[in-house]
Amino acid sequence: MSERVSERGDAPWRAKGCPWAAVVMMTVIVSALAGTLKEARADVTTECEFLEISAKAGDKPAIDPALSPVEKKLKKPPFSTWNQFKLLSHLQKPLAKKKAEPIPLKIGSATATLVEIVDKSKVRLTITMDDHKGKQVANNTATVEAGDYLIYVHGLPNNEGHLLSLTCK
């Protein structure tokens, strides 16, 4: 069997170019780019520290020494309602972009989601907090400067509070 030959002497698939080869090449390129973009999105991470704190009003002020990074904030309103603060739990956790991470608490539970990194020095996070009965008591998206602390508050009976403080690097 002989191949048909074009005027230039090429086989027909070479004579007019190969449209299906271009389609295959484009598919390969698009797939590679999509994979690269997926990897780039997955690489957006940050390391966060979570402090679970109990707060109450008492006769003598007392702040757990482990809370020294947030001590100044705890002495200002609205936290100055209480004067006794005790660390309940401490957790370091990496967060990946758009992935909700569970934050185990002594009282209830929480989740943290890294929304995005802003200006290379700030992180935008969504935090949800549930009480011990599973009722959501906080759901907030906020931007925090690296090294600064956010504090979420859940008021409890008897003028007590349940606080979740966090910072990210």
Q: What is each PLM-predicted segment?
A:
Residues M1-C18:
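N-terminal secretory signal peptides that target proteins for export/translocation
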Residues A21-A32:
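Bacterial N-terminal signal peptides
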Residues A32-L33, N158:
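Amphipathic, positively biased hydrophobic alpha-helical segments used for protein targeting
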Residues A40-K169:
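Outer membrane pore-forming secretion/assembly proteins and partners of Gram-negative envelopes
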